[in-house]
Amino acid sequence: MARISNVNVPTNKRVMIGLTYIYGIGRSTAQKICQEVQVSVNKKVKDLSNQELVALRSIIESKYKVEGDLRREINLNIKKKKDIRCYEGLRHIRKLPVRGQNTHSNARTRKGKAIAIAGKKKPNK
């Protein structure tokens, strides 16, 4: 397996698909990186030369925030919004959808499992 940005990229996949295993790199970014290094997107990772791997690593490290750095930046941005208590921050604090989605009947993933509300007890017959 080729190792790029502390991620094991599968060798039997195409280069473009293999790069998407790195957090922060999607298909379009992977395609741009391949064009920059002048590697065919259809080439398999196992067929890459050492020079091409080094070029891929250097471009990813110099131009893109990936993996831990990107996760850290996203978490800091969310924390900053929570601290200044803006609308988005309040939605994060309350564990509700942030981007304007409806919550009346949906948003179970974000809100968590439904909690039963105790109602009136029915009289025994």
From Swiss-Prot:
Record InterPro entries: Rbsml_uS13_C, Ribosomal_uS13, Ribosomal_uS13-like_H2TH, Ribosomal_uS13_bac-type, Ribosomal_uS13_CS
- The residue ranges crossing the membrane are none
Q: Name one GO biological process term.
A: translation
Q: What does this protein do?
A: Located at the top of the head of the 30S subunit, it contacts several helices of the 16S rRNA. In the 70S ribosome it contacts the 23S rRNA (bridge B1a) and protein L5 of the 50S subunit (bridge B1b), connecting the 2 subunits; these bridges are implicated in subunit movement. Contacts the tRNAs in the A and P-sites.
Per UniProt, what is one GO molecular function of this protein? structural constituent of ribosome
Known partners and oligomeric status? Part of the 30S ribosomal subunit. Forms a loose heterodimer with protein S19. Forms two bridges to the 50S subunit in the 70S ribosome.
Keywords carried by this UniProt record: Ribonucleoprotein, Ribosomal protein, RNA-binding, rRNA-binding, tRNA-binding
Question: What's the name of the protein?
Answer: Small ribosomal subunit protein uS13
Gene coding for it = rpsM
Top-level taxonomic group: Bacteria
Alphabetical GO CC annotations of the entry are: cytosol; small ribosomal subunit
Q: Which family does it belong to?
A: Belongs to the universal ribosomal protein uS13 family.
A Pfam family matched by this chain, by name?
A: Ribosomal_S13
